[in-house]
């Protein structure tokens, strides 16, 4: 039964992404200003989080897992920030995406995975990064088991960097929002360092960004209720201590 569920979920995700042509669609690349604006929001939050947990000067020595890496859109960013290619690992259920990622970044490590299992040993990574992946996992049990896997492969004092949307898209039944309470329930034993809303609502961004990048930045900055995603920083700790990240993130 478990194998059937795993195969069904993998087949579903592969079919959806294949139908959308996601891996080769310029709409989901930096040449699209609206997409780039969205990525800048995630970049700012990620870089600020790395600085506040003290990882920004250590990236060359840290092992990073991109969970649901797709065709490795984020790997160029990690390398530009100072990460060592050999320390970057990506996993995805989509074999085609992993093949594309391997061709782009041959020095990095890529593996196809099955739902419910990340194919690496306990405490293998300093950072586990997921960007809009859990919203594609519709099954609640599978979400919890996948979250547990992310914690399992994370080293003590390592961090999960999380970005996903918190509102359902009525035009897309293939995704399901992950709200703040959902994140807390998915990671009950991990210390929450930060949870804040980022990314201007896509319908608004599609209007503002082509007209004025500055107007889009102003709107996102001044009206947090128009932000549709949550960026979270979760730390796996053995010590009984609590630290909050700076409000500036």
Residue ranges and their predicted role:
Residues 2-56:
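Conserved class I S-adenosyl-L-methionine
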């Amino acid at each position: 039964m478990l194998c059937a569920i795993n195969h069904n979920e993998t087949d579903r995700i592969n079919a959806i992404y294949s139908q959308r042509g996601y891996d080769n669609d310029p709409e989901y690349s930096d040449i699209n200003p609206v997409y780039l604006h969205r990525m800048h929001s995630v970049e700012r939050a990620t870089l600020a989080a790395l600085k506040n947990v003290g990882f920004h000067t250590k990236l060359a020595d840290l092992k990073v897992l991109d969970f649901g890496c797709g065709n490795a859109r984020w790997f160029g960013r990690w390398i530009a920030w100072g990460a060592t290619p050999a320390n970057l690992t990506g996993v995805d259920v989509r074999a085609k995406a992993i093949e594309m990622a391997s061709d782009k970044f041959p020095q990095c490590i890529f593996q196809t995975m099955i739902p419910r299992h990340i194919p690496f040993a306990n405490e293998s990574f300093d950072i586990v990064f997921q960007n809009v992946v859990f919203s594609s996992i519709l099954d609640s049990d599978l979400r919890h088991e996948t979250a547990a896997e992310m914690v399992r492969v994370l080293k003590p004092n390592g961090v999960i960097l999380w970005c996903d949307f918190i509102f359902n898209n009525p035009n897309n039944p293939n995704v399901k929002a992950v709200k703040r309470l959902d994140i807390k329930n998915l990671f009950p034993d991990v210390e929450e360092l930060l949870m804040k809303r980022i990314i201007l609502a896509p319908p608004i961004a599609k209007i503002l960004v082509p007209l004025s990048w500055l107007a889009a930045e102003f709107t996102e900055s001044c009206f947090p209720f128009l932000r549709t995603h949550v960026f979270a920083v979760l730390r796996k700790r053995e010590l009984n201590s609590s630290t909050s990240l700076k409000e500036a993130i």
